[in-house]
């Protein structure tokens, strides 16, 4: 059973996140291992396994990027284990330039510049995410897979910038 079916949701990118949360809570109550404490060993094991599956499904579907990766996996794109990389030279050069800029910001310890950088990267991420939504809505799986790969780069860059922000705030 796929994660969307587990939560009673249609297998598409845009989902009702409130319904996801409510169904998660229901499933957690229904399959919590403590409810099976007096059951057989097989029942206890099944409850633990089901609870783990529910938690994994929840973590996957609640985050936009992992939800997209999972949806693509249902259509034959195993992005989680692939060695495939982005072939868009212009995008890769842009990423290299952004990484160098982040390194410069770290050296200068310029809080204002870092804040501006984080906002710019977030805008880039949001724009790509909107492209991804349209691609998934139109079942453009190949293009969507490439966009997810690019979003991973931006997500890592955003994470690095936020870690630098925390580091600079600790000084």
From Swiss-Prot:
The entry's function note states: Co-chaperone involved in the maturation of iron-sulfur cluster-containing proteins. Seems to help targeting proteins to be folded toward HscA.
How is this protein organized at the quaternary level? Answer: Interacts with HscA and stimulates its ATPase activity. Interacts with IscU.
Please name the GO terms that the record assigns under molecular function.
ATPase activator activity; protein-folding chaperone binding
Q: Does the keyword Chaperone apply?
A: yes
Show the taxonomic lineage. Answer: Bacteria, Pseudomonadati, Pseudomonadota, Gammaproteobacteria, Enterobacterales
| SUPFAM superfamilies for the chain | Chaperone J-domain, HSC20 (HSCB), C-terminal oligomerisation domain
Classify the source by domain of life: Bacteria
Q: Give the protein's recorded name.
A: Co-chaperone protein HscB
Q: Where is the J domain?
A: 2-74
Which CDD domains does the record cross-reference, listed alphabetically?
DnaJ
NCBIfam families per record: hscB, PRK05014.1
- List GO terms (cellular component aspect): iron-sulfur cluster transfer complex
What protein family does this chain belong to? Answer: Belongs to the HscB family.
Keyword Chaperone in record: yes
Keywords assigned: Chaperone
Any single biological process term in GO: protein complex oligomerization
- SMART domains annotated for this entry? DnaJ
């Amino acid at each position: 059973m796929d994660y969307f079916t587990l939560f009673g949701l249609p297998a598409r990118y845009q989902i009702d996140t409130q319904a996801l949360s409510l169904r998660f809570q229901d499933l957690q109550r229904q399959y919590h291992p403590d409810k099976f404490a007096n059951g057989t060993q097989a029942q206890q094991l099944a409850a633990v396994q089901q609870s783990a599956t529910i938690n994994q499904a929840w973590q996957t579907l609640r985050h936009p990027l992992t939800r997209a990766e999972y949806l693509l996996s249902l259509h034959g794109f195993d992005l989680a284990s692939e060695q495939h990389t982005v072939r868009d030279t212009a995008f890769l050069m842009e990423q290299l330039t952004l990484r160098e800029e982040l390194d410069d910001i770290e050296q200068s310890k310029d809080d204002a510049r870092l804040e501006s950088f984080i906002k710019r990267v977030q805008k880039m991420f949001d724009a790509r995410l909107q492209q991804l939504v349209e691609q998934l809505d139109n079942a453009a799986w190949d293009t969507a897979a490439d966009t997810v790969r690019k979003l991973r780069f931006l997500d890592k860059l955003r994470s690095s910038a936020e870690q630098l922000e925390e580091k600079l705030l600790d000084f």
